[in-house]
Each structure stands twice: as C-alpha cells, then as structure tokens.
Amino acid sequence: MKIAIVGGPTAVGKTDIMIEVCEEIGAEIISMDSRQIYRYMDIGTAKPTPEQRKRVPHHMIDILDPDEYYNAFLYRKDSLKAVEAILKRGKIPVYVGGTGLYADALVRGIFEGVPADENIRKELRELERREPGILRKMLEEFDPEAATRIHPNDLKRTIRALEVYMKTGRRISELQKETKGDDRFFIIVLTRERYDLYDRINRRVDRMIEMGLVDEVKRLLSMGYSKDLNSMKTIGYKEVIEYLEGKYDFEKMVHLIKRNTRHFARRQIIWFKRYENAIWYNLTFVSKEELKKTLKELIVKNFSV
C-alpha cells in the first residue's frame, strides 16, 4: 500500500482538482498545510470551502487556535491517526498541500533525538538580539547543508540546528539522514509555468481582498491574538497588520502580498525538487480531464499495491 502526497506551490490548483479526483475514487483528503490547521484563519489560508468539505471529508484543518504551538513532529503523529481512521472506513487517504516540512516529516521521518535546552536557546536569542544575522553566519559555518535548507528568516529552525550542534557536536543535517524514512508514501507534484502560476497568485490575492481578508485580520486582532504569533506572520496576515498600523497604504499592501506569495511559491517549488522520485505534472500544458484520469489511476494503483 502506497499513499499519495500531492504537493506543489500555492495557487497551483491542488485543492480544486484533488477534490474532484478524491470524490470520484472515494478518497478523503488530509491537509498538508501548516496554516490551514488554525481556526478563524480562513480567507488568507485559502481553506477549502464548506461546500468542498461536504463533497470530500477533510482532515487536519481547524484543529488549533492561532496561539497554540504545533510542529512537524506533531503533524506527523496526528495525521497518521487520521490515516488509520480513514483506512478503517475503507477509504483511501490522500495528503494534499504545499508545506514541504510536513512532507519531509512523512517521507523522511522526524529527528527528535536531542531534547530542547532553554539555556542554549536563550543564549542564542540574546546573541542574535545583540548582533542581528550572526546566527545565520554561524549556521553556514557549522552546518552548510542545513543552511541551504533553512530560510535565512527562519530563526526558530536556525536556533534548533545550532542548539543540536552545541549539545552534540554533530550537525543536524547528518543526524536527520540517520532518521528512518517511511516508504508508505509516494509524492506527486503539481506545477505550472511561472507566468501562469504568478497570474493565478495575483488573481487569488485579489479574490482574498474582495472576500474580506482585511476584516478577517481585524477580527483576529480583536479576539486578542497578537501580531507576534507565528500564525499571524503568515503571508497576507502580516502585510494586512502592517497596513492597519499605517506602515503603508492599501495599494502597497496588496502589492506586497502578491510579491511575497510569488517568492513563497518559488521556494516551495525548490523544496519539492529535492524529492528525486517525485512525479511531476505541469498544469499549464495538461488538460484538467486528462490529469484527473491520470491521477485517479496513479493513486488507486499505488494504494492497491
């Protein structure tokens, strides 16, 4: 039995096509999106609509409040429980989403062997406060491979990698390779030509604004959720907050959301290219009906192995 992970960049069209595919093969969708797990954050995370969720059952959506902690280790554990429940119902589980870290957790396993050390973390945070950018330089020196995988702005993962090195004297990239992978999964990646994808991103952002993204952010702030929460730093929410603070005007806000989303999509594509055995489909050149037929056959065939 092989379970499909259908990944790809934001706005490529994963949700729409996979709802139709899963509806026709009797499958249930497990969201692989690190932002759709949060309640009240609907428009800016492009959650499936209530109508879509009625057509095909979805899992790992709306499971946490925006101020609750979550990570890839917990995602793997919780989503595999969903897999078990789906299998007991005689249905096919299919992962759909663009969070590469969650895909890694499933396919390559999670390295959790070194306990957290708050003293080291505090020391590293203080070092970064005194000299911004120093932790990135340290990571590039001590673990160049990890530095290529961790975004320069991802302070949390940078600190974790340095913490592991300081505690063990070993690189986290080496320890992660020793983590046992999981061969129950195979990866399908949906992509588009850049001009096509960027146009879809721009139009999606316009729709989010029309649907009330600004009001959604205002409501979250009025509920007491801090702008400093990890969830509130999501693209779309962060820019709206800064607009509400008067840092720039409405047009600049929209421009920044579009630009930052395009950059994010590019990083997602780079991430999924790391999976050597992934099966890629370019939606710019393949018809929807042809792709649906191919995906249905591929998912069912591998599930039946």
Swiss-Prot record:
Keyword annotations from UniProtKB, A to Z: ATP-binding, Magnesium, Nucleotide-binding, Transferase, tRNA processing
Binding site residues for substrate: 10-15
Catalysed reactions, semicolon-separated: adenosine(37) in tRNA + dimethylallyl diphosphate = N(6)-dimethylallyladenosine(37) in tRNA + diphosphate
Top-rank taxon, per record: Bacteria
Region of interest: Interaction with substrate tRNA: 33-36
Gene Ontology BP annotations: tRNA modification
Alphabetical list of InterPro entries matching this protein: Dimethylallyltransferase, IPT, P-loop_NTPase
An annotated Gene Ontology molecular function: ATP binding
EC numbers for this chain: 2.5.1.75
Function of the molecule: Catalyzes the transfer of a dimethylallyl group onto the adenine at position 37 in tRNAs that read codons beginning with uridine, leading to the formation of N6-(dimethylallyl)adenosine (i(6)A).
Name of the protein in question: tRNA dimethylallyltransferase
Protein source organism: Thermotoga sp. (strain RQ2)
